[in-house]
Amino acid sequence: GYSWELPRLASGMSAGLPRVYDIALETISHGDGRLDPDSLARFIIAYQTVTTLTLGELWAIPIMLRLALIENLRRVGARIAHDRVDRNLADSWADQMIDTAETDPKSLILEIADMARSNPPTSSSFVAELARRLQGKSPALALPLTWIEQRLSESGLTIEQQVQAENQHQAADQVSIANSIGSLRFLAFMDWRKFVESMSVAEGILREDPAGAYAEMDFASRDHYRHALERMARRCALGEAQLASLAIALARAARQDGNER
């Protein structure tokens, strides 16, 4: 398929993946899922100060950004689902302890022992949910929280810190999801023709046509020339920008030769 024609990374975390997909992942990560025309342009311009992107890569940016945004939503969704499992576990223990505290307070210590033996997680989602359910209910229900506090202290943490961390995680997830959904909408309305032409190094060189004819062409005609450039670049050792420079140099030489005659 088309993606196999794109340059791929030879090493690193994204080895074997199209280079432009790695760029998309970096772009999404850098802005926590938020995209806008200016930030995207700045990112691509900065990248091209090191490595020039091909026309094919520039045209692939929108689909790669969509994939990166969907991956970001998947990652956040997986984390939320994992946290939900911990919260459900906390709810289950809270239900049992609240019921025992009301019906058989003397057996509460046995419930706490059962929870301790089960080695519950000390994740912020578990701790925050258990604290939310048990705090302020009755003096007896302070016992399981005391055990949790002692368990957390082994890692240098407190219940309050874990509650605060959970609130921050949930807020960050909400922002990331909102940004990603907003960015998917942005991708649908972005003028990608204008973007590719403004970002392409080869395009900028072709517009230096000494006759000024290339810049005056309509988009379809310019695209025809660019496709020819891509085909030639795939068949020789020169890159698109180098071929464009060579074409302009030949055009200038021919124009100068014609003027001299």
What are these regions (language model features)?
Residues 1, 91-261:
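Basic, amphipathic N-terminal segments
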Residues 1-17, 41-42, 59, 67, ...:
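ATP-dependent phospho-/nucleotidyl transfer catalytic cores
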Residues 2-8, 43-52, 204-211:
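Short amphipathic alpha-helical segments and their helix-coil junctions
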Residues 8-11, 27-33, 62, 115, ...:
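A ubiquitous short alpha-helical element
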Residues 12-19, 35, 39, 122, ...:
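A generic short alpha-helical patch detector that favors 3-5-residue windows
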Residues 16-58, 65-82:
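Active-site activation/catalytic loop segments of kinase-like enzymes and analogous catalytic loops
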Residues 64, 76, 246-250:
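Short acidic/histidine-centered micro-motifs embedded in hydrophobic/aromatic stretches
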Residues 72-79, 83-84, 95-106:
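Extended charged low-complexity segments that act as oligomerization/scaffolding linkers
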